[in-house]
Every structure is written in structure tokens, then in C-alpha cells.
Amino acid sequence: MKPVPTYVQDKDESTLMFSVCSLVRDQAKYDRLLESFERFGFTPDKAEFLAADNREGNQFHGFSWHKQMLPRCKGRYVIFCHEDVELVDRGYDDLVAAIEALEEADPKWLVAGVAGSPWRPLNHSVTAQALHISDVFGNDRRRGNVPCRVESLDECFLLMRRLKPVLNSYDMQGFHYYGADLCLQAEFLGGRAYAIDFHLHHYGRAIADENFHRLRQEMAQKYRRWFPGRILHCVTGRVALGGGWYEAR
């Protein structure tokens, strides 16, 4: 039988606007997320919901789960978010408007989020932040100016185009710094990362455990060969990448 090819066009023909992907351990927290997204306009004709299932144990980690989810996504834009976020006063129309404004301002954007650190800040004595979020540190918090270009993003809410994906490193694993890694990979691809103004509530609490410090060291060791001397600002603190190729092991 003669093969029947599919002719692919250079355009996004998806009828869905969003694929909302979540890394899920706690079903109750995820149910709260689902209810809030539905309440704020992410209806079945506009969005699909996919869950990386860690309810029975960690079969996915931060650097791996995006890769598993992307091939299954059908939306024009893919959201990667924690299970413990909740929409509180911004919804579907607000996010679409924020994306459209970003598209017009900088077509080279590849990754966006709601909390990050401004790109290449001049002052390294304090950690630079750009965000609008409610979290364990306070309600309706604002730091810096959003939208703005950033060099790292918090993992609680990440966004990219399905047809312009950015993947995390294959040589790292864990649940910390994969947002920063994603932004640095976007730089390698010739793109940029942005923090946008899309207020939501993140109930999570960052834990600086042994794995946090291990990944911090691995990030510095990995990226110093390409960015020698750079001080990378993240919402959880600064990472001094160190020297050049002679320090890479």
C-alpha cells in the first residue's frame, strides 16, 4: 500500500489556546488548581489539563517532566506549573493579553513566568527580583517591574510556545533550579525569558535542603564554562558561577 503522507504547514493549527501541565503529588492541591482555572475561564474549549503523576512516588523530577509532557500537548501555549498554585484575580483573558503584549514587545521570547530575576543586574550586593505574586511571604507582593526580561524564573508557573519549545538539561536531575536552567537554555537558543504580570497564589514553600545545595553547585559547575565570572540571580538567591574552562570538571 502506498504511504499517505501528512503535509505539515508552517503555522499553528491548534484549536486550543493552552495546555496546562502540572507536576502532581497531592490530589487535593491539584483539585484546588483545577477549580480555580475553570473559575477563571480556562474552559475545555480553551484549555486542556495534563498531570505528571507523582502521586505514588517521584517517577518525574523537575528536569525531566517537561520533556514527557510536551509531545502530548495540543495547545498553542504550554503552561508548566506546580500543583499548589491557585488563580485568584487574573484569568484566561488576562493571560492572553499578557502574551499578546509580550509577542509585540519581543518576538524572541521563549520562556515566561510570574516571578524571576532581571537579566544581568548591575548590583550584585542584593538578589534582584521581578514578580507579582501572593505566596508564603505575603499577599499581592510586587518586586521590581513586570513585565521585564529575566535571567531566571521561579518554577511555580512557566509558559512557552508549543512550537518553540525549550527543554531542560539532560545531565541534571532534582526539583530545584530547573527554571533557571530553562532560561539559560533559552539563551543558548537565541531567545529570551520574561517575567509577566499574571498574579496568582503559590502556596509552596522553598526548602533549602541537601538537594537544593547539590543542584546549586551543579548549576555553577555546568554553566561556568560558558558564562565565566557571571553571577546568576535567582529568586532564591545568587549563584556565582565562578571561573572559566579550567574550573570545569
Swiss-Prot record:
It comes from the Bacteria. Disulfide bonds: none annotated. This is ATP synthase subunits region ORF 6. It comes from Fuscovulum blasticum.
